[in-house]
Amino acid sequence: MVKQRTLNRVVKASGIGLHSGQKVMINFIPHTVDGGIVFRRIDLDPPVDIPANALLIQEAFMCSNLVTGDIKVGTIEHVMSAIAGLGIDNLIVEVSASEVPIMDGSAGPFIYLLMQGGLREQDAPKKFIKILKPVEALIDDKKAIFSPHNGFQLNFTIDFDHPAFAKEYQSATIDFSTETFVYEVSEARTFGFMKDLDYLKANNLALGASLDNAIGVDDTGVVNEEGLRFADEFVRHKILDAVGDLYLLGHQIIAKFDGYKSGHALNNQLLRNVQSDPSNYEIVTFDDEKDCPIPYVSVT
């Protein structure tokens, strides 16, 4: 049986909030069977839990925020991507502020931290959401589409007319597994244009942004001295974001995802469109690991 998984032990770390620029504590806590992914604001008294649910997402500036009432947890997509990449079903993510720390702008540090906690199988079948027919979300020329597929394939295309974005590196395809995610996707960093930074900081946004946690792009190219980690790092990061956004459906998805210039808002709309019609999907489990179309890292 393909089983649900959580962590073996608590892991604690800290980092800088992208928008606040302040230190944020983050703790990963093992959770119970069918508990799902839950974000917990421990800076509040009493602490407030917000489940990682697509219907609780509100888009802020270039990130996904979970919101309940007037309480939010922002910039969740990179840690959600790491959680999905390792196939973790049940986890409590404690944060000491209204946003998850940005770390280095990728999912890599979260992969490292979660692996420090160790993966533990739980005595319950892992649930998957199998897409049964095409579902799409469209905004202007942007699109996000699910199609039936025996696995989880992500195809993404960005479209930037800019010297830093070589045309041959604006599309990428990933057949999702823990191995491909960790080695081909998780280290891809977020990116932004230097010309936007002064405006953002003047409006109390991106106060924690730096070349230590993002790829900076000016009028001619990449500003970071070390350059890119991959020739197609920009589009790989969009795939990273999509993996995190799509995991808000509650379970690993079995489908093909095609994104063209898609972002957090459109990815979320796609999930809402899936949920709007129960005939779009079914919940499946696998009694034999050989039948599972998505390979995960083994739990030892």
Swiss-Prot record:
If you read the UniProt record, what top EC class would you report for this enzyme, in one word? hydrolase
Q: Quick check: keyword Lipid metabolism in the entry? A: yes
Q: Is-annotated flag, keyword Transferase?
A: no
According to UniProt, the reaction catalysed is:
a UDP-3-O-[(3R)-3-hydroxyacyl]-N-acetyl-alpha-D-glucosamine + H2O = a UDP-3-O-[(3R)-3-hydroxyacyl]-alpha-D-glucosamine + acetate
Gene Ontology CC terms, in alphabetical order: membrane
EC id: 3.5.1.108
Any idea which positions bind Zn(2+)? Answer: 78, 237, 241
Name the SUPFAM superfamilies on file: Ribosomal protein S5 domain 2-like
Q: Which NCBIfam families match?
A: lpxC
Protein family (similarity comment): Belongs to the LpxC family.
Put simply, this protein is called UDP-3-O-acyl-N-acetylglucosamine deacetylase
Species, as recorded: Acinetobacter baumannii (strain AYE)
